[in-house]
């Protein structure tokens, strides 16, 4: 279509009015500036996913009336954002002669002693059920402290409460970032094994990675893959971006020997654990593919032995304290793990336990009663995992790292996971998250993850999001948010529709960014938002205003076939040469992405065309590196022989940027050529199962990693 806006006739239609009323986009402009209007059947389906009936004309009008009436008659919004240091106005509804009375209970349980002023509202009077509703405003004072508070408002004998999220205006940069920058490494934790590993990298390996990278290279952070909770027994989803829960962490990374209980095992039990470890030690030398399931089956046997040995009085008290701190939320994951353990993986059928039963089902209660020890075992595993991850971050800070762990937050969760099964009301029903068509994915993308329901978020004070962010900052110095545009809008795809047949649903980004600012400030941490691709100007502006860094990837910093000089990159970003969706630098320079896509049948056109495009990109990058003085032109005479020099030039370019954070990839530093993840594949390629190896295919063990000559050369460049 040539128009870029909806006409008045379309805007007046009830289905369009209803969609806009609840934040559903009825049109959008694509990446190529192409304009699209959303079909009615898509809007009806997305409204249904929000719990709103739009099945016919009468239902649409009734839904509009119901929603508007609810908004007009509620005294206060369920969730209110307050910016610390500024006055905030809260809209209050009541009768013309009613005088609102308000009080605030602070997060710590005390009463706010300051004065809450009342300010007159608009002259607009709304007639509702034969009465009249007027609007006035409560003014929350600038000195209201940060935190999650409870606002209680009484009007005309009726009382309502609202969650007040009192957050800093922005996240302040760390002192070392204000005038300069910090650099660190990025890696996939599971891929880096030591002699003490059980087949994949674990939390003890992470501790060593952090401490050794600071000690031997001067790095100040380690960006790692998401550590969200996974399945408790095989089959285990390999992608860390499709977790069972984002509230809890992955206990398959536990190192049994690092637990205090291991040290006091009986000789017989200790011998059993050691023998189990010996069984999987050969996995550490496999350079081809990681075997998570064999690793976990074996490690789990060892953990059962340790669990059954019991806890000392002090350790039991620490476990009890953990359970008290996490509250009832631990029951969601532990119960789901028990069900998965005993009833198996979801198969999607109507008889599937995930569909058939819910948290209150009698069958679930019976299973919990039948296996109390297994239920406690899963609670215990989560506690142990949390302890070991926390110990890794603590060791990083004690070693002198300014940040330590940069945790990665996935976009969403598995549709059959514990978050969705335990609290389905928090999620949209009958829709998944994805992306509209673009130049790389002409049919759009469906990520198979149910979106959070923005209406439920508002009604519950965004508690699920608050808890998740708080949990991540408990064990990290920074959080990277995958697809941060999702805090502003998400592409919803109705069940049964193609990925292209969806629309955007908007979220209250100010509140979600406020939560990030509050949790990051409390932790003295940093937030990085993955904002690659085309980002609306208002999103970039909002992220910047909140002190959230974006992402700059050297291979993506191009326009019209020319690469942007690193000195011209935006400063408020985490810069890297590549991402986990691309081959490492050596593989990319050797056109590994072309070869792999051809091999897997992922090319939409002739391989010659893709190769030609890749060569043009390749040559443009090398030209930029030469023009900017990062690479001597003589290196181009034999690129393969001078590959290390070219990779060094890529990193000299990275170091030449003004970006506040810079990350070097460990895979680049050891010469690895294989990509960790090939988008558009599942079983065709071993995504998220590639162990760390050098360019010759030899395993690089953690014990030798920081003595690697190439790694030290790249570290020297990053230190400047």
Predicted segments, located by residue:
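Carbohydrate-interacting/catalytic domains
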Residues: 1-224, 262-267, 521-522, 526, ...
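Amphipathic, non-membrane alpha-helical segments in soluble helical-bundle scaffolds
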Residues: 12, 407, 506-510
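Acidic/aromatic-lined carbohydrate-recognition and catalytic surfaces
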Residues: 49-110, 114-115, 123-148, 153, ...
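Alpha-amylase-like alpha-glycosidases and glucanotransferases acting on alpha-linked glucans and related
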Residues: 109, 233-386, 412-661, 667-668, ...
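Secondary-structure transition/capping motifs at alpha-helix termini
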Residues: 157, 215-216, 394-404, 473-479, ...
């Amino acid at each position: 279509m040539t128009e870029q806006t909806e006409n008045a006739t379309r805007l007046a239609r009830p289905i369009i009015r209803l969609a806009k009323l609840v934040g559903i986009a009825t049109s959008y402009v694509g990446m190529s500036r192409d304009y699209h209007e959303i079909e009615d059947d898509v809007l009806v389906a997305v409204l249904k996913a929000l719990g709103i009936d739009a099945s016919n004309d009468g239902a649409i009008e009734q839904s509009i009336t119901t929603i508007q009436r609810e908004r007009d008659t509620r005294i206060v919004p369920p969730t209110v954002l307050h910016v610390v240091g500024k006055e905030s106005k809260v809209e209050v509804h009541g009768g013309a002669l009613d005088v609102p009375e308000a009080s605030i209970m602070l997060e710590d349980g005390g009463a706010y002693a300051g004065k809450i002023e009342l300010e007159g509202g608009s002259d607009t009077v709304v007639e509702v059920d034969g009465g009249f509703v007027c609007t006035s405003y409560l003014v929350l004072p600038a000195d209201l402290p940060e935190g999650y508070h409870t606002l209680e408002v009484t009007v005309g004998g009726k009382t309502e409460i609202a969650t007040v999220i009192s957050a800093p205006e922005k996240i302040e940069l760390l002192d070392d970032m204000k005038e300069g920058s910090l650099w660190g490494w990025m890696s996939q934790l599971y891929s880096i094994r030591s002699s003490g590993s059980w087949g994949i990298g674990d939390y003890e390996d992470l501790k060593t990675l952090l401490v050794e990278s600071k000690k031997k290279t001067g790095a100040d952070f380690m960006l790692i893959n998401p550590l969200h909770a996974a399945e408790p027994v095989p089959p285990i989803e390999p992608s860390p971006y499709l977790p069972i829960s984002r509230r809890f962490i992955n206990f398959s990374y536990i190192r049994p020997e690092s637990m205090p209980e291991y040290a006091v095992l009986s000789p017989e039990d200790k011998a059993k654990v050691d023998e189990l470890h010996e069984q999987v030690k050969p996995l550490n030398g496999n350079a081809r593919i990681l075997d998570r399931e064999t690793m976990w089956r074996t490690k789990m046997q060892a953990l059962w032995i340790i669990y059954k040995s019991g806890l000392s009085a002090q350790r039991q008290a620490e476990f009890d304290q953990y359970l008290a701190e996490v509250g009832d939320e631990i029951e969601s994951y532990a119960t789901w793990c028990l069900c998965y353990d005993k009833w198996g993986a979801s198969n999607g059928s109507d008889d599937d336990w995930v569909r058939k039963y819910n948290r209150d089902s009698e069958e679930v209660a019976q299973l919990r009663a039948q296996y109390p020890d297994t239920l406690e075992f899963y609670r215990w595993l989560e506690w142990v995992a949390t302890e070991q991850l926390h110990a890794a971050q603590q060791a990083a800070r004690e070693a002198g790292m300014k940040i330590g762990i940069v945790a990665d937050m996935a976009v969403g969760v598995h549709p059959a996971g514990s978050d969705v099964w335990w609290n389905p009301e928090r999620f949209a029903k009958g829709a998944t998250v994805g992306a509209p068509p673009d130049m790389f994915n002409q049919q759009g993308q469906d990520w198979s993850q149910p979106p959070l329901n923005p209406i439920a978020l508002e009604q519950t004070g965004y508690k699920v999001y608050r808890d998740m962010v708080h949990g991540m900052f408990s064990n990290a110095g920074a959080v990277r948010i995958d697809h941060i545009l999702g805090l502003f809008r998400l592409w919803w795809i109705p069940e049964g529709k193609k990925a292209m047949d969806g629309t955007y649903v908007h979220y209250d980004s100010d509140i979600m960014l406020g939560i990030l600012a509050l949790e990051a400030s409390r932790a003295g941490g940093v937030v990085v938002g993955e904002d690659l691709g085309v980002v609306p100007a208002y999103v970039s502006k909002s992220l910047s205003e909140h002190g959230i860094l974006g992402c700059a990837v050297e291979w993506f910093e191009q326009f019209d076939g020319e690469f942007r000089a690193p000195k011209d990159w935006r400063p408020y970003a985490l810069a890297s040469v590549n991402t986990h969706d691309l081959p490492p630098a050596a593989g990319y320079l050797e056109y590994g992405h072309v070869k792999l896509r051809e091999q897997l049948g992922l090319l939409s056109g002739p391989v010659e065309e893709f190769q030609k495009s890749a060569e043009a990109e390749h040559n443009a990058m090398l030209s930029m590196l030469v023009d900017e003085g990062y690479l001597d032109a003589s290196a181009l005479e034999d690129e393969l022989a001078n590959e290390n020099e070219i990779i060094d030039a890529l990193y000299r370019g990275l170091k030449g940027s003004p970006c506040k954070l810079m990350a070097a990839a460990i895979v680049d530093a050891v010469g690895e050529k294989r990509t960790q993840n090939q988008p558009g594949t599942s079983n065709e390629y071993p995504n998220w199962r590639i162990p760390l190896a050098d360019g010759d295919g030899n395993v690089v063990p953690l014990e030798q990693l920081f003595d690697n000559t190439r790694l030290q050369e790249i570290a020297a460049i990053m230190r400047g």
